[in-house]
Amino acid sequence: MGLPVADFTLLLATTDEFCLLQPLRDRMKLVLRYEFYSDEELAIVLLHRITALRWSVDDVVLVHIAYRSRGTPRLALRLLQSCHRVARSVDDKTITAAHLHRACELEEIDDLGLGPNEQKYLRLLEAGPIRLNVVASMLALPTRTVSQVIEQFLLRAGLIAKDKSGLRELTAKGRDRVSNACQQTV
């Protein structure tokens, strides 16, 4: 006995297509893989949001928020919202670079958009290459979270690399980042 079902289109969105069952993946007619947004595209997204909400912002702030957002609109919009909260807390009508700086301080976000876990991850690798399970235990996070959430941007940004045996290590760019961060805190 069959059920009559009208024609329909099923849209799937995932960041890990291999978590889907093979029969479902086989039935996909079209697979699209999107790239991360550029800083310029993120600035446009932010400008649209600011216009829709009728907020006032210094133009330079948009560029700095976009740069800290890792190519991801939701991160850019979240940081914009944080800046707006900071501006409102001091009764300012315009979001300025000072508000962005304070929002980043409160959320412990550095100038590249790295949060506390990513910053700690980089400092752990300063001593030398480490296996994923060791990094995860030192961060008190599941290995899957470390590999899929924390490492994703660090690899894309060229701050870390994986060697043939699976050890995580800092790249030259990553070492520069850690040494510069240490100098700024001193």
Question: Where are the language model's segments positioned?
Answer:
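AAA+/SF3 P-loop NTPase mechanochemical coupling elements
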Residues: 1-13
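Conserved AAA+ ATPase core "coupling" helix
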Residues: 6, 19-55, 59-67, 77-78
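Flexible glycine-/small-residue-rich
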Residues: 12-15, 36
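The conserved phosphate-sensing helix
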Residues: 58-59, 69-84, 94-96, 114-116, ...
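C-terminal helical "lid" of AAA+/P-loop NTPase domains
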Residues: 62-68, 74-89, 120-124, 151-152
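Conserved alpha/beta core segments of nucleic-acid transaction machinery
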Residues: 85-128
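Terminal-proximal interaction/regulatory segments of ATP-powered molecular machines
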Residues: 126-186
